Amino acid sequence: MEHLSRGMQQKVSLARALLTSPVLLLLDEPTTGLDPRSKLEVQDFIREVRTLHDATILLCTHDMVEAEMLAERVGILDRGELKFLEPVDEVKARFGVETLEEAFFAATGRSFEEETEEDRDREVMA
């Protein structure tokens, strides 16, 4: 598979996973590092899998827009703690926000600036 593009590798990996008709499909950052066209193709493939197969898909992503586009329900993990697992609209309503990114900051009690400072501190400690 090394001669395939990263996007094609992702699609082949997803297709291989479906050969066994799984009841649970775990996808960890399936579109990270892909060019825009490949990212859309993988997202379309995930939607197709949701539509055609009776499987639960657990999608881990840092891309809040992608999560909103692909998920029926979203959960936010903060330092290993699951803050909630709800439909996207309920998450936004719960925090009175318009985006999942805003919901993340509301759920974790941190602002963007604080998150950035903590990330820098972690980098220094590493």
Could you say what each language-model-derived stretch is?
Residues 14:
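Hydrophobic anchor residue at the start of the ABC signature
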Residues 21:
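Conserved catalytic motifs of ABC-family nucleotide-binding domains
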Residues 25-28:
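Catalytic Walker B motif of ABC-type/P-loop ATPase nucleotide-binding domains
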Residues 36-38:
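Helix N-cap at the start of a conserved alpha-helix in ABC-type nucleotide-binding domains
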Residues 40-53:
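Helical segment within the ABC ATPase nucleotide-binding domain
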Residues 85-86:
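ABC ATPase "signature
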